[in-house]
């Protein structure tokens, strides 16, 4: 497992170690022990995942930008097991020097890359292939009453989603999220969300 730090502290790209031969390939998609050994020293704390989710979406589907409000905040470890997606984490912690900034990474069935999104970030993705199967691990259970989001179509975020706007396919809920300028974040850089 190779851990790549990004330009925003705590947001990580994870490359698994692949074993290939004439039959195909094998890799450990997740090892709690190795994740804790390699990621906890970077983050300054451990992360314990408790729920796995999977979605299937067609080209142009955009999901996000989602988060859960305190006290039900979530970290996520995501990957694309079929197809291709552009995955994005946006810093929405008040007082953060990178507030409103984002990290984008292409996750594909071929690169096997995983993306770690810490608490205090909004998360979303756009499907770039005909279909995509997307999996994610969460360190807190889903609480619908704590659902939150910011607009995935907010131009001020400067995200190039790599799909034409007229091909974007959003849920009704995701069309109603506030733009960043109108958003009152429930997160603060000075509050440790992992305590």
What are these language model-derived features?
Residues 1-110, 131, 138-195:
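Non-catalytic, conserved peripheral segments adjacent to functional cores
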